[in-house]
Amino acid sequence: LAVRKYLVIEEIPKTWMLGKADWNLRQLPEPADDKLLLYEKRLLNGLFESGDQVELSALRKTFAERLQAVKDALYDDMVSRKWFLRRPDRVRQTWVVIGSLALSAGIALTIVLAIFTKLGLLGIPFALGGLLLLIGAKWMPARTAKGTAMTRRVNGFRIVIEKAEEHMSKWAEQENVFTRFLPYAVVFGVTDKWAKAFESLGQLPSDTTWYVSSRPFVYAQFADSIDSFSVTTSGTIASTPAGSASSGFGGFGGGGAGGGGGGGGGGSW
């Protein structure tokens, strides 16, 4: 969203050396040449529910309750694109329930048979079967042929991003490639490689105005800052008050095409 000019990320200088990093998020007018998907709209509205500026730390333990609406829209989008026949999260939940019931029944059967008969071992297969279902629940959502094709495309693009240095001659002639594909590098966990590849060109990226820092632009430091922001954001918006169930932001993109929610010109990041 920042790369696409929906918001600006501003580093907040630390007041002391061991202080925690924080960022100010500032909403911008919606670009005329870009459209948001429903889950992106919900994410943006959730971030700026209280105004057009918010500090990232202020979202801790408050955003998680809004996150479920974002995830619902994301999973619905996956189904509407025909990547899955059913929402992956609901398929997983179904198998977790079945596995839990089988495990509980197996344990209960083992105890009852052990007390009243000599056939206590007969309940163990049910318990083991339930345990296996619980472990395998996250792999149960099956992609459609279209979803599998998208996964292959994403995995292929991941290889391209990971080996960015091999494509520098082509990308050097294109405008704003570093910034445009940076969100993918973050998702794929290769921000440092992406930055080093473009640093070798010996020129600064054309547009990083969406990220404001008091330090001059250096590729390595910029990659570091972006990774730090990404990790902090993931933890912050999924953080719940003590005693509440976690929303589990780690599952936000799970079950999709190679882990990505898909669509929206570069993801919601």
PLM feature spans:
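Donor-sugar nucleotide-binding helix/loop cap in glycosyltransferases
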Residues: 2-106, 116-117, 143
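Short hydrophobic helical membrane-anchoring segments positioned at the boundary
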Residues: 61-69, 73-88, 92-93, 128-131, ...
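Hydrophobic alpha-helical transmembrane segments and adjacent interfacial helices
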Residues: 104-113, 132-135
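Hydrophobic alpha-helical transmembrane segments
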Residues: 111-130
